[in-house]
Design a protein with these regions (language model features):
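Short, low-structural-confidence N-terminal segments
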Residues: 1, 21-29, 90-97
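Short loop/turn segments at connectors of secondary-structure elements within structured domains
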Residues: 31-35, 80
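Beta-strand signatures of extracellular beta-sandwich domains
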Residues: 36-40
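Mature extracytoplasmic or organellar-lumen-exposed domains after removal of signal/transit peptides
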Residues: 93-360
Length: 360
């Protein structure tokens, strides 16, 4: 990704790859108008990276691709869609011992995601009950509780597009409709929807308006749609690996920066949810990964423990969500420490997909 002559461009370094595991490395040199890239097939997102600010280190994701035509979608680029041709057929899924262990892990993780989105569904209904009653303080408490379930699972479910909508149409993007942040440009055709629009009203406005009630009703409906979708999903080991890595990357890009919860400042609650979700995805892969690279498993175990120990230092039973409010002062003093403990874990998790995708 680079800006050339005032236009933000997004280019592939090859337009054809053989079927099988493919690792995509994404670098944004100086294109401020582009902050995400998605790999699509038949309007379905099969891989993605977000928060690609100019100048950050390159990031990667690994997916197993079968033969056919795919599209690389870079929202905001001068040419948003590019075609990637995958030749041949992907090798048959390995059936050896390690593959079987990893396969069981994906089933366990699918059960976990169904559980989390089910609890999210209950959580937004509780939030809606408080909003409809006009109780601001009860709504704030319900908001914090519901956020945790979204943050544990967001990397797995955020790419869903409702039937009848094209990728890139925010009217059908469940991620936009549920979790659009204050820092994200508002789609004028759709408006600001979801959790953070409600957060704005509760904390910045300090009042529940008819508009807040409408937003809450919509949120319940959209989470209900998501709840229906996740029960049908199946995952590959690399999906779990990429998801765990993405959740930790989310912490670096939106939690430590204070971008996620711009009004409530419960970013450390979201931080904890991302860690828990990443840990669950990793734990589902761990028995198989231990047979592939036991040293990496020990390293990741230690890094998770370091993160959890650091996070424990911010617990506050009197605060909303059980963690200290992430004030500007706390961010200024502690962001470097939080970044230092998160980065090594992200680097380690980012190598897992390549290891599990070909395991036999």
């Amino acid at each position: 990704m680079a800006n050339d002559g005032g236009k933000d461009g997004c280019a592939l370094d090859t337009t054809s790859v053989p079927a099988g595991p493919v690792t995509f490395t994404v670098a944004n040199t100086n294109a401020p108008g582009i902050n995400e890239v998605e790999l699509l097939r038949d309007q379905r997102i099969v891989g993605e990276k977000e928060n690609l600010a100019p100048g950050l280190d390159p990031v990667s994701f690994t997916v197993s691709l079968d033969g056919g035509a795919y599209q690389l979608y870079c929202p905001g680029a001068s040419t948003e869609y590019q075609t990637l041709t995958v030749t041949g057929n992907a090798p048959a899924t390995p059936t050896g011992t390690v593959a079987s262990i990893l396969g069981q892990g994906t089933k366990d993780y699918a059960t976990y995601i169904v559980n989390q989105i089910g609890q999210l569904n209950d959580g937004v209904k509780a939030l809606d009950a408080a909003v409809q009653s006009g109780n601001v303080e009860a709504a704030k408490a319900a908001y914090a509780k519901a956020r945790l379930f979204w943050e544990r699972s967001e990397s797995t479910v955020e790419g869903f597009v409702l039937p009848g909508f094209a990728v890139g149409d925010n009217a059908g993007s469940l991620d936009y409709l549920i979790d659009m942040r204050e820092s994200t440009p508002v789609d004028a055709k759709v408006g600001w929807k979801g959790f953070h629009a409600i957060e704005r009203d509760l904390w910045q406005g300090g009042a529940i308006t008819p508009g807040t009630k409408a937003l809450s009703t919509e949120l319940v409906g959209n989470v209900g749609k998501l709840n229906g979708i996740v029960a049908t999903l199946q995952y590959k080991p690399e999906d779990l690996a990429n998801g765990a890595s993405d959740l930790i990357e989310e912490i670096q890009n939106t939690k430590i920066t204070g971008e996620e919860e711009a009004f409530s400042h419960i970013d450390l609650v979201d931080f904890s949810g991302n860690v828990e979700g990443a840990q669950q995805a990793y734990a589902s892969l761990r028995p198989g990964l231990e047979k592939i690279d036991a040293n990496l498993v020990r390293q990741i175990d230690q890094q998770f423990q370091s993160v959890l120990t650091t996070l424990d230092g911010y617990r506050d039973s009197t605060a909303l969500g059980g963690y200290k409010t992430y004030t500007a002062a706390l961010k200024a003093s502690d962001a470097p420490k939080l970044t230092a403990v998160i980065q090594p874990l992200h680097q380690s998790l980012s190598t897992v997909a390549q290891k599990v995708v070909t395991a036999g």
